[in-house]
């Protein structure tokens, strides 16, 4: 005599079959998601999704963190539901539960996230504040924009991201530190700020991949209120870092968080950076910091002397401002060097300053122009300067023209479009191609590399 109720047995068997069918369906859906979104996106967001159960037309999935749940719900849920319905018409909805995995980094994310955010960034330099920043025409827009971002609790429409660009030593990093200091010291706002270089962002990303803490990395960076990335040109050519930066950028913008980015050139001129990233970097306010004027350099020196509480004759300050034109770092370094002459009992005069800074002054006076580069390269290869501007594609002309473009990028502060215009109205893409060609030849052809080094000496 059987003690098993046939109806209960049949119901139990149906549930097993259904669960098995849905497990198979889920494996198929996972493959479809992988093919649909690609390896990087799948591994970043969808690989942690687990099938739990299904009943009464509802599928229950699980993820290890609340953050992943929210991201999937906003960005992928509609597609996942559609794929489920293609497999089983009875599925009406999907729910995601958060199930922390034991013995994994994801189980300690929420516990450590708050304190770890503070360890993400680089230390701030206490010297770099808005009060210590000398404003002039070349940096006025960048300063005003930076101050507005720092003082606003929420991102300002049209200023997110704030993108600052300019040559080395012109004040980009100073402004970024100033923004961070202002926010950190603001009594009214408790915003989490992270400032770091693009190089450190890449290093932390690689470390997270190696230690299998990638979800912790994602949560840390996506939980900040203000993310500031310095020298973003560093991610050029680094595909996986660019992919992660792209997703971090989008996540913060979607959450209405502020981004401040800096580079040594405008977004459109960032060679080796994906177009989709360059496009997003230009979404907000792009402010350039131009080369300093005499008046601005003199103002910087006067402010520095006041901070140092020391006396430097006005004619010496004017001499420095007139002759040290490369960047602010060199200008301040020159002032420090001249100031130290007083420690050995020498009087500070224009003559003593000129003697002390002989090498630096020589390099600053060596301002190389594109026209000079074209002339010297043309002479070296025994061609005409007009060949630099022509559209003739002879090999004997193309290579010297590319070399001249390469040196124009290396030795001048001109933008890529400006360089292209100086070579017969070519576009910036042509300049990029020329520079990459020369760089590749230098790496692969030792004789060519020697020739380039020989040419380089002509401009020193």
Curated annotation (Swiss-Prot):
Where located? Cytoplasm
- Per its UniProt record, what CDD domains does this chain match? AAA (cd00009), Bac_DnaA_C (cd06571)
Q: Where are the transmembrane segments?
A: none
Q: Which family does it belong to?
A: Belongs to the DnaA family.
Please give a single GO biological process term from the UniProt record.
regulation of DNA replication
**Record note on domains:** Domain I is involved in oligomerization and binding regulators, domain II is flexibile and of varying length in different bacteria, domain III forms the AAA+ region, while domain IV binds dsDNA.
Q: Does the keyword Cytoplasm apply?
A: yes
Q: What is its main location?
A: cytoplasm
Q: Where is this region: Domain III, AAA+ region?
A: 123-342
Q: What is the lineage of its organism?
A: Bacteria, Pseudomonadati, Pseudomonadota, Alphaproteobacteria, Rickettsiales
* Role: Plays an essential role in the initiation and regulation of chromosomal replication. ATP-DnaA binds to the origin of replication (oriC) to initiate formation of the DNA replication initiation complex once per cell cycle. Binds the DnaA box (a 9 base pair repeat at the origin) and separates the double-stranded (ds)DNA. Forms a right-handed helical filament on oriC DNA; dsDNA binds to the exterior of the filament while single-stranded (ss)DNA is stabiized in the filament's interior.
List the residue ranges of the region (Domain II).
Answer: 91-122
Region feature Domain IV, binds dsDNA, mapped onto this chain: 343-460
Q: Which organism is it from?
A: Wolbachia sp. subsp. Brugia malayi (strain TRS)
Please give an example of a GO cellular component term from this record. Answer: cytoplasm
Query: What is the protein's given name?
Result: Chromosomal replication initiator protein DnaA
User: Keywords of this protein's UniProt record, alphabetized?
Assistant: ATP-binding, Cytoplasm, DNA replication, DNA-binding, Lipid-binding, Nucleotide-binding
Read off the Pfam families from this record: Bac_DnaA, Bac_DnaA_C, DnaA_N
Q: How does it assemble?
A: Oligomerizes as a right-handed, spiral filament on DNA at oriC.
């Amino acid at each position: 005599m059987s003690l098993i109720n046939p109806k209960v047995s049949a119901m139990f068997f149906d549930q097993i079959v259904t669960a098995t069918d849905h497990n198979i369906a889920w494996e198929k859906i996972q493959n479809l998601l992988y093919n649909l979104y690609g390896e990087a996106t799948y591994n970043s967001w969808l690989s942690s999704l687990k099938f739990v159960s299904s009943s009464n037309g509802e599928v229950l999935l699980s993820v290890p963190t609340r953050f992943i749940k929210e991201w999937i719900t906003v960005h992928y849920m509609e597609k996942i539901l559609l794929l489920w319905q293609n497999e089983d018409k009875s599925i009406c909805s999907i729910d995601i539960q958060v199930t922390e995995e034991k013995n994994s980094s994801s189980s300690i994310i929420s516990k450590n996230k708050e304190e770890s955010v503070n360890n993400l960034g680089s230390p701030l330099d206490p010297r770099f504040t808005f009060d210590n920043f000398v404003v002039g025409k070349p940096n006025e827009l960048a300063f005003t924009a930076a101050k507005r971002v720092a003082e606003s609790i929420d991102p300002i429409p049209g200023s997110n991201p704030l993108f600052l660009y300019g040559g080395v030593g012109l004040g980009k990093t100073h402004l970024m530190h100033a923004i961070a200091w202002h926010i950190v010291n603001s009594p009214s706002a408790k915003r989490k700020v992270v400032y770091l270089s693009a190089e450190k962002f890449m290093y932390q990303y690689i470390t997270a991949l190696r230690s299998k803490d990638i979800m912790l990395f994602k949560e840390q960076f996506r939980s900040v209120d203000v993310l500031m990335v310095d020298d973003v040109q560093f991610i050029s050519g680094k595909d996986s870092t660019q992919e992660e930066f792209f997703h971090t950028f989008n996540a913060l913008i979607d959450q209405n968080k502020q981004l401040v980015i800096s580079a040594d050139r405008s977004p459109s001129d960032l060679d080796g950076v994906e177009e989709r990233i360059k496009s997003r970097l230009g979404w907000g306010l792009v402010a350039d910091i131009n080369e300093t004027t005499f008046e601005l350099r003199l103002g910087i020196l006067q402010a520095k002397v006041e901070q140092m509480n020391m006396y430097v004759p006005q004619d010496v300050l004017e001499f420095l401002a007139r002759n040290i034109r490369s960047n602010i770092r060199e200008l301040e370094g020159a002032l420090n060097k001249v100031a130290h002459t007083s420690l050995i009992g020498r009087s500070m005069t224009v003559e003593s300053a000129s003697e002390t800074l002989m090498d630096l002054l020589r390099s600053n006076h060596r301002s190389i122009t594109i026209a000079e580069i074209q002339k010297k390269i043309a002479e070296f290869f025994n061609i005409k300067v007009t060949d630099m501007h022509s559209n003739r594609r002879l090999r004997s002309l193309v290579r010297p023209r590319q070399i001249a473009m390469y040196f124009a990028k290396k030795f001048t502060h001109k933008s890529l479009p400006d360089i292209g215009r100086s070579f017969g109205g070519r576009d910036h893409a042509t300049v990029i191609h020329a520079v990459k060609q020369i760089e590749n030849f230098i790496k692969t052809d030792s004789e060519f590399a020697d020739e380039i080094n020989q040419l380089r000496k002509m401009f020193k």
